[in-house]
Amino acid sequence: EKLLLNMNSNKDKITSFTSFGNFDPSYLWTNEDMKLYPKENLKGKNILTITSSGDHALNAILNGGSMIDSFDVNQFSKYVSALKIAMIKKYDYYDFFKRMDWIENVESLNFNSRENIIDSVRKYLSHDEYLFWSTFEYLRINNKVHFNDVINVYGNLKKNVYSKALSYNKLKRNLKNAKITYYDSDIIDIEKNVNKKYDRVFLSNVLEYVLATNTPHFVDNYQKVISGLDKILLPGSVIYGYDFSNVSKYSDNISEHLSYKYDEASCKSCGVQQKIFSLSKV
């Protein structure tokens, strides 16, 4: 309850590196075209992802990843991610998307006003996760918080590879052997909070915020972030990012003492300039 009612302090908790806050509504779905990311076997890989909607971790698990560390400065993101994962574990393909469609359009966790989704998936939630969502529902019913204080229904489930039944069922199976560890952390601090090194890092468009323009202030922040990440990367590792504006020069602005190979793939069907890019450690 304290966490949920602490949202008004969000303005004091904006990170200095991006405009993200500790208590922002978390996306229900990704707004990236996840099909742009290369399909590779992630079995046995140490993986670090931004939490956000949870879809980067889910995509990694679909591709065989089982050891996922997930971080976000937004403390609501891990709860939204955990709820989606619990629902995937509980429901088959049709029932999952029927309930997600209800959540998205009706903005309620009481499906058809008869089924309390939180209670239905309780066995798949940790004690902390169940307590958060049951408290959220209590406060929402009593008009102390609003649905969109925590869940932002913006996004597009069709951009996820698990929107197809075959992929959904594979993801459901893979989740049985996967573990996600969540960290409440900004990108600049993540190297201080984890105790392992990674093969793959999926950052969504966080680096686009860090390197918002190619001016000295933003370039300095970007170099600090990449230098910090470099400390927790294994040889041959790859950082993946997403860019909605195609303004930032990710390769040109890396510190001279670091060696990374840059590559990118543009979205041909987005209607706007979007791309994924990779920084491969060499």
Where are these regions (language model features)?
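Core SAM-dependent methyltransferase catalytic element
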Residues: 261-282
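Conserved SAM-binding loop of SAM-dependent methyltransferases across substrates and taxa
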Residues: 54-65
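Conserved class I S-adenosyl-L-methionine
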Residues: 44-52, 69
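Class I S-adenosyl-L-methionine-dependent methyltransferase module
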Residues: 3-8, 20-21, 76-176
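A short acidic, Gly/Pro-enriched loop at the edge of an enzyme's catalytic core
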Residues: 190-202
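Conserved beta-strand signature within the Rossmann-like core of class I S-adenosyl-L-methionine
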Residues: 236-243
